[in-house]
Regions:
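Extracellular glycoprotein-like low-complexity segments
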Residues: 1-153
């Protein structure tokens, strides 16, 4: 479940992918509610996360722009902060920080994610609303549509 998100899209001239995405999202893995347990394969640190941005509402069939972060590296042992600096599976240059928040009862974890990515194809994202989908390593996902994305500002 995605609770909150901010999105800042900057389009650059040239052949796609050339655009920039700056975003934050706060989300919870609610798998425990469904399965009554948390799967080890759901580790965002080990298996990363996919962020998708699209114009329209969550149910829209518009093209999604994906940034898949393959894994995160803890900043220090026991730290609730982890980062990733490198290429996404789609070839974008990514700087991302994952903060593990206090685990709420009945969930498998809550997180805050910041992603700065360049060389992303965001040509289809031209106006609000904008939908952000967070896909966990097991394929489950949550989406939130917002009406206040910053586009070319």
């Amino acid at each position: 479940m995605v609770h909150a998100t901010t999105v800042d899209v900057t389009h650059f001239p040239g052949t796609e992918p050339v655009d920039q995405l700056d975003m934050t999202a706060t989300f919870t893995n609610n798998e425990f509610i469904e399965l009554k347990h948390c799967e080890p394969t759901d580790s965002l640190i080990l298996h990363g996360v996919k962020v998708s941005v699209q114009q329209g509402l969550c149910s829209a069939t518009t093209r999604k722009s994906n940034v898949t972060i393959p894994f995160f590296t803890p900043l220090s042992p026991g730290s609730n902060l982890a980062d990733y600096n490198g290429s996404s599976k789609e070839g974008a240059s990514v700087d991302a920080v994952l903060r593990t928040l206090k685990r709420l009862p009945g969930t498998c974890g809550s997180y805050s994610l910041r992603v700065d990515a360049v060389n992303v194809n965001l040509a289809a994202v031209k106006r609000n609303p904008v939908a952000v989908t967070i896909t966990l390593p097991d394929g489950s996902s949550g989406c939130l549509s917002i009406n206040n994305a910053l586009i070319d500002q």
